[in-house]
């Protein structure tokens, strides 16, 4: 009896291995856990065609919005680990969602098979145009002296813009009133109107207003300068040693997906990013394409864990919760 069970297990294992090597044999679904037409969706639609060509099967995009990206993420976490559904995740779905509630609907570290980071989105500290500081040291000095009367805005409680300012405030050592909005647009409008003092946003969103001289850019909040704002020094360069609030977007498969499928999808991602026209379109959006060594499943697995560790203390200290 035991020999029969062992033989059946071996047959099933061999069959699964063959299926993994043959993958994909039909259409693959990329789940984007945000509404169609948004900035993340735009990136997905840039990458899907060249990735489809690399895989030899069409990748279709399914937008499943809701719960800050958690609804679509949960769908993939519970999907069959056969490679035919994968998730476009990011800092929100795999970091903030885990820290802002006592009972996350899924585990970012345990419920997915990491595939590859495909873009890194630099962030920037922006202020109202008449804010009395032009550099980060000047901003810090003013904020420490005037924090009781200052306000910062965000796209909403628990949003990336909110969490980035939480991390920055913690690093500086200030306690400033948070004003949540329903989206970055209204927050920027109020900052331009002088009703709030600063916002920590992604460069791709803030860039038109910076170039139009409607707001001030004080510091890049990423490890390296942005290609599209190369003259703006990083927080690290301006004395906030080691500060890094980079956002990232990456692909994930369900936990238990065979390694050959994971590696194949990672290669398709990297192949797409190596195309000159893809890089150009992404960089024109203010996004950074990671080098090959940061496009691997192993790198992404470590990144998810390190990001959770980095953000845990500031989020806890802020008292922010979605419960």
Task: Please provide the spans of the model-predicted regions.
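Short beta-strand->loop
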Residues: 107-117, 175-179, 197-198, 207-244, ...
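Hinge/capping helix and adjacent helix->loop/strand transition within the periplasmic-binding protein
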Residues: 78-84, 99-186, 235, 248-281
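Short secondary-structure boundary segments
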Residues: 90-91, 129, 203-204, 222, ...
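Bacterial N-terminal signal peptides
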Residues: 5-15
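N-terminal (or domain-start) structured segment
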Residues: 20-110, 149, 157, 173-202, ...
């Amino acid at each position: 009896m035991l020999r029969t069970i062992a033989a059946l297990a071996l047959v099933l294992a061999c069959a699964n291995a063959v299926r993994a090597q043959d993958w994909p044999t039909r259409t693959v679904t990329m789940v984007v856990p945000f509404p169609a037409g948004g900035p993340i969706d735009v990136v997905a639609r840039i990458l899907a065609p060249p990735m489809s060509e690399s895989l030899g099967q069409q990748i279709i995009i399914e937008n499943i919005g809701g719960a800050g990206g958690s609804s679509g993420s949960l769908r993939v976490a519970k999907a069959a680990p056969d490679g035919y559904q994968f998730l476009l995740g990011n800092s929100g779905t795999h970091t903030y969602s885990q820290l802002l509630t006592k009972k996350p609907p899924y585990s970012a570290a345990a419920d997915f098979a990491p595939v590859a980071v495909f873009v890194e989105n630099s962030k920037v500290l922006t202020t109202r145009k008449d804010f009395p500081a032009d550099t980060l040291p000047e901003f810090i000095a003013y904020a420490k002296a005037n924090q009781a009367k200052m306000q910062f805005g965000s796209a909403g409680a628990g949003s990336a813009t909110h969490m980035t300012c939480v991390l920055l405030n913690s690093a500086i050592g200030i306690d400033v009133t948070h004003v949540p909005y329903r989206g970055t647009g209204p927050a920027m409008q109020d900052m331009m109107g002088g009703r709030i003092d600063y916002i920590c946003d992604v460069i791709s969103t803030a860039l038109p207003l910076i170039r139009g001289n409607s707001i001030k850019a004080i510091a890049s909040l990423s490890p390296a300068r942005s290609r599209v704002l190369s003259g703006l020094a990083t927080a690290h360069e301006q004395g906030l040693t080691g500060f890094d609030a980079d956002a990232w977007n990456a692909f994930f498969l369900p936990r238990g997906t065979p390694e050959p499928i994971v590696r194949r999808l990672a290669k398709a991602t990297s192949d797409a990013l190596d195309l000159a026209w893809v890089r150009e379109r992404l960089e024109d959006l203010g996004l950074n394409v990671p080098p090959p060594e940061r496009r691997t499943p192993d790198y992404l697995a470590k990144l998810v864990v390190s990001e959770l560790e980095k953000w845990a203390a500031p989020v806890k200290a802020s008292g922010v919760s979605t419960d």
